Amino acid sequence: FKRIENRLVGGDDYHGTDGPLYLTTADCDNPLFDTLFAAAKEAGYPLTDDVNGYQQEGFGPFDRTTWRGRRWNAARAYLHPVMKRPNLTVQCGVMVNRIIFEGRRAVGVEIRRKGRTSIVPGDEIICCGGAINSPQLLQLSGIGDPERLEPLGIDMVQSLPMVGEN
């Protein structure tokens, strides 16, 4: 995480300052937070100055990815700066059904848009569907546990039984 962070209050052993994702610490200097932290302490919870630092358990100021009053997300940090690259295609309103392989090499994706299925070739395929959809997409593409995929008629590309188990 250190490499992605640009923590505006400075870096330390747990936070970076050179990454593209702006990170600010919430201003907790108000009666609501004072009351919340006092109640947490009274209930036996630890207090911490940095919930993403050494002592993660407990209550304390939280970091947020904001910059100049706007949420600063992964799209703003990574995608928007490279949108004009000739080797990048971003399509919205598209469902990716599976990754197309030739042997073990990804050569495209099968997509569905407005009820129509088509194949989009690509020299580089980036699987970035998050914690749920990335393993699902890999499994639908034949990467995963053969005991699960073969009964569904999915041709195996690579036996990796732990895909989807995290």
Predicted ranges, named:
Residues I99, G108-N166:
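Glycine-rich loop(s) and the adjacent beta-strand/alpha-helix scaffold that form part
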